[in-house]
């Protein structure tokens, strides 16, 4: 059976760890070449080596809030691997606090990384993809953008905004052969979630009908689906990867 992403080139932001790294691993396993972007260059270089080194994975320092950084990231893929087939806008941060205690800076930081960062990645990737009349853009939203979470007015707003942006961009780009879809993960096992107090973890887990947290690899599988021709007639969709939480 042929690999789903054979000879395709993908750019993944937030690629040094977590979901971004898991997506990179799965993409390479499916035959893709990847360029990982992250603000932590050292960690990104380590991740690229884990994926197989320069022949299949490159590391670039990228602050997604800066359009010039994103442009360099994408152009690295074009120059080193000959094109851009898939863009995964995954970079993210959290600055959780109630509205009473959240600072304006904390709000702005989260909006800038998630929402502006995704906009930068989507528009700059589309500028390259339109030349070939094909491409797949995958944006990382969250269940938090669907239902809202206490202490996450910034994060929930940003993730909901990504849904609206995905749908608007899908309509703008469909005639160019560019598909734009989003993933909305729920409770996914990671260093961040495993650091939660046990009481909070148990509360969140109780909301999941499947009775367990998801694994990063399970989100990566959905990213492969949206990046590949398996989803060739899908654009503007948001796929929940939540184990049934908040259905």
From Swiss-Prot:
Q: What EC number(s) would the UniProt record show?
A: 1.-.-.-
Residues bound to substrate: 142
Residues of the active site: 155
UniProt keyword list = NAD, Oxidoreductase
* Residues that, per the record, bind NAD(+): 19, 38, 63-64, 155, 159, 190
UniProt cross-references to Gene3D superfamilies, sorted A to Z:
NAD(P)-binding Rossmann-like Domain
What molecular functions are annotated in GO for this chain? oxidoreductase activity, acting on the CH-OH group of donors, NAD or NADP as acceptor
- Which InterPro entries does the UniProt entry name for this protein? NAD(P)-bd_dom_sf, Sc_DH/Rdtase_CS, SDR_fam
Q: What is an annotated GO biological process for this record, any one?
A: fatty acid elongation
This protein's record includes keyword NAD: yes
Q: Which Pfam families match?
A: adh_short_C2
Enzyme's top EC category: oxidoreductase
The record's comment on protein family reads: Belongs to the short-chain dehydrogenases/reductases (SDR) family.
Protein name per its UniProtKB record? Uncharacterized oxidoreductase Mb1385
């Amino acid at each position: 059976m042929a690999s789903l992403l054979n000879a395709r080139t993908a750019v993944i932001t937030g690629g040094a760890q977590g979901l971004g790294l898991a997506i990179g691993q799965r993409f390479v396993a499916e035959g893709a070449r990847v360029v990982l972007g992250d603000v932590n260059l050292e960690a990104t270089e380590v991740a690229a080596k884990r994926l197989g080194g320069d022949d299949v994975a490159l590391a670039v320092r990228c602050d997604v809030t800066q359009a010039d950084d994103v442009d360099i990231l994408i152009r690295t893929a074009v120059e080193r691997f000959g094109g851009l087939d898939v863009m995964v806008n995954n970079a993210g941060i959290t600055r959780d606090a109630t509205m009473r205690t959240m600072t304006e800076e904390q709000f702005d930081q989260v909006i800038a990384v998630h929402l502006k960062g995704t906009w930068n990645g989507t528009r700059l990737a589309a500028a390259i993809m339109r030349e070939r009349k094909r491409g797949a853009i995958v944006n990382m939203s969250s269940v938090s953008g669907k239902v809202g979470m206490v202490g996450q007015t910034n994060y929930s707003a940003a993730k909901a905004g990504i849904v609206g942006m995905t749908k608007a961009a899908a309509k703008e780009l469909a005639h160019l052969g560019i598909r734009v879809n989003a993933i909305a993960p729920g409770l996914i096992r990671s260093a961040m979630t495993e650091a939660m107090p046990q009481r909070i973890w148990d509360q969140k887990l109780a909301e999941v009908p499947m009775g367990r947290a998801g694994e990063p690899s399970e989100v990566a599988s959905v990213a492969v689906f949206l990046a590949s021709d398996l989803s060739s007639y899908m654009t503007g969709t948001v796929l929940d990867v939540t184990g049934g939480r908040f259905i």
